[in-house]
Swiss-Prot record:
This is Ribosomal RNA small subunit methyltransferase B. S-adenosyl-L-methionine binds at C254, A255, A256, P257, G258, G259, K260, D277, D303, D322. It comes from Yersinia enterocolitica serotype O:8 / biotype 1B (strain NCTC 13174 / 8081). Pfam families: Methyltr_RsmB-F, NusB, RsmF-B_ferredox. Belongs to the class I-like SAM-binding methyltransferase superfamily. RsmB/NOP family. The lineage of its organism: Bacteria, Pseudomonadati, Pseudomonadota, Gammaproteobacteria, Enterobacterales. It catalyses: cytidine(967) in 16S rRNA + S-adenosyl-L-methionine = 5-methylcytidine(967) in 16S rRNA + S-adenosyl-L-homocysteine + H(+). Keywords: Cytoplasm, Methyltransferase, RNA-binding, rRNA processing, S-adenosyl-L-methionine, Transferase.
């Protein structure tokens, strides 16, 4: 049966909601995916994520092909053309099908009179494709990052910035966390092999497994039974550093969507975990993950800056603070971050992080452990944050994490490894 919807127009609307309304793809896509087939959901995701990943290149190409930009109510058609260009450059969709479906998107968006224009622009691109892409490769658009972020990455990593950009611009690997309550990693790797799913263990993180080719979670052995969770390898490092022990009181702050909460409980099933997040809607994901893995935690809504409101005078043996951050380490998973973030956000986020860590530190028992973590690669949110905290608190000791960074561990995104992530392990004397 022929679809009653046009996927390219849906993708253009999603991109408009990100770029013009400041919404994240993870917020926008679930609602749009409800009305389309399972098969088309994957393609919609590819069109949206892919277009946003290479946005500057597509924008530059359109500037060469059109005398005037499409603005105002016609802006969504600008994004429709982008979706068309993305298909022609980056997908295996036959060009005639990509063109036909994209042009038809104008009808779905109730402006059939623009079909001729869209068709003309895309066909002109086809004729000039080789030349345009060669020229695009020789200007700043080929970095595929906003100029402010490019400048910050170059400053922080003068010898590694190009590798970081390259990793950010690639599709992310799919990492799993094996639930040690059900199987050892070796046992689960054998189950994957039996299911004809190629996978490799991580060299450093004991529960992490990388799939050679990403697959649907429904294809993973025992996913619904809680045998495994999809979680990046670097994110798994938080709980390895935290090292929870049975019988302890543990706080997981900024806990949503629950990957680290459940990892704590898999590592030490007899701990008591309080999982707190300011976003009530995202906390529902924590509950869903706990339910699938058949684990239990105390889940509460709360602001990290005001802990007395949600835990009173309770103190904890260990605290995991996965602080709100710029998410510059996970751009390959969320390419919309590049266009939603602003340079001014970094100082604001650093201030918020400072307020949270100051407010929560008194809740850690003497002799207790706090792991401060972010999915950022920017020093202002990481090493500099911890350096100023240590200056303020003589009773805090930084534990050596065995890595390059003198103040904590800074992972950088890598095509065959984890995301960009930072951890610092602190002990209260």
């Amino acid at each position: 049966m022929k679809n009653t919807y046009n996927l390219r127009s849906i993708a253009a609307k999603a991109i408009s909601q990100v770029l013009d309304q400041g919404q994240s793809l993870s917020t926008v896509l679930p609602g749009l995916q409800k009305s389309i087939s399972d098969k088309d959901r994957a393609l919609l995701q590819e069109l949206c994520f892919g277009t946003l990943r290479v946005l500057p290149q597509l924008e530059w190409c359109i500037q060469q092909l059109m005398a005037r930009p499409m603005t105002g109510k016609q802006r969504v058609f600008h994004y429709l053309i982008m979706v068309g260009l993305y298909q022609l450059i980056y997908t295996r969709i036959p060009p005639h099908a990509a063109l036909a479906e994209t042009v038809e998107g104008a009808t779905a968006l109730k402006r059939p009179q623009l079909k001729g224009l869209i068709n003309g622009v895309l066909r002109q691109f086809q004729r000039q494709q080789v030349e345009l892409l060669e020229r695009a490769a020789n200007n700043d658009s080929h970095y595929l990052h906003p100029s402010w972020l490019l400048a910050r990455i170059k400053l922080a990593y003068p010898d590694q910035w190009q590798q970081i950009l390259d990793a950010n611009n690639q599709k992310p690997p799919m990492w799993l966390r094996v639930n040690r309550l059900h199987h050892s990693r070796i046992e689960y790797l054998e189950l994957l092999k039996q299911a004809n799913i190629e996978a490799l263990p991580h060299d450093f993180y004991p529960d992490a497994v990388r799939l050679i080719t990403p697959c649907a979670v429904s294809d993973l052995p025992g996913f619904e039974l809680g045998w495994v969770t999809v979680q990046d390898a670097s994110a798994q490092g938080c709980v390895d550093l935290l090292d929870p022990q049975d019988g302890e009181q543990i706080l997981d702050l900024c806990a949503a969507p629950g990957g680290k909460t459940t990892h704590i409980l898999e590592a030490a099933p007899k701990v008591h975990v309080l999982a707190v997040d300011i976003d009530e809607q995202r906390l529902s994901r924590v509950k869903e993950n706990l339910q699938r893995l058949r684990l239990h935690a105390d889940v509460r809504v709360g602001d990290g800056r005001t802990p007395d409101e949600w835990c009173g005078d309770q103190q904890f043996d260990r605290i995991l603070l996965d602080a709100p951050c710029s998410a510059t380490g996970v751009i390959r998973r969320h390419p919309d971050i590049k266009w939603l973030r602003r340079d001014s956000d970094i100082a604001e986020l650093a201030q918020l992080q400072s307020e949270i860590i100051e407010a929560i530190w008194p809740k850690l028992k003497k002799g207790g452990v706090m792991v401060y973590a972010t999915c950022s690669i920017l020093p202002e949110e990481n090493q500099q944050q911890i350096a100023t905290f240590l200056q303020r608190h003589s009773e805090a000791d930084l534990v050596e994490t065995g890595t390059v960074s003198a103040l904590g561990r800074q992972n950088l995104p890598h095509p065959e490894d984890g995301d960009g992530f930072y951890y610092a392990k602190l002990i209260k004397r």
